[in-house]
Amino acid sequence: CKYSVYFMQKDSSDNLIFPVLPLRDVIVFPNMVIPLFVGRDKSIKSLEVAMDDNKQIMLVAQKTADLDDPQDKDIYRYGTLATVLQLLKLPDGTIKVLVEGSDRAEIQGEIYGDTYFEAQVNIIEEPMVDDREVEILSRSVIDSFDQYVKLNKKIAPEVMTSISGIDDPARLADTIAAHM
């Protein structure tokens, strides 16, 4: 790899068990606050378990969005550990939940559970990088995204104002990816 960026995983003794929420057509990044509408029984139970414990839940994307009952093989291994900020039960039996992504994480082993999904999760530390190189790359990414915003009328130009003020390279990448 040309760039001095690499990911480190914490020691396996730091692995913890968390409820897992498979997501359809959405990816949640660290530092992102987003409402989700949840209706599947296993997913609702995963949220209830998270609320009863420490409000932490592993958010991972499904490989195919139209599966109503995804199995371990249908779910990506990497996702975001998130905190449930608010949970609202709706009259139709579904749940509206507000979550905030906190850490990139990897599922270790299998996702298991009969009534809800849970898995052993390993937090991935942020990459170690050269500050000068990061500054140059960040500027290049911001310039490229600015061109993208000018060509794509679906993104409000004000987004560039908030992106220009982000100093953390991981947060910059996550914020830009969320707008793609």
Tell what function each PLM region has.
Residues K2-M180:
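N-terminal low-complexity, acidic/polar interaction/targeting segments
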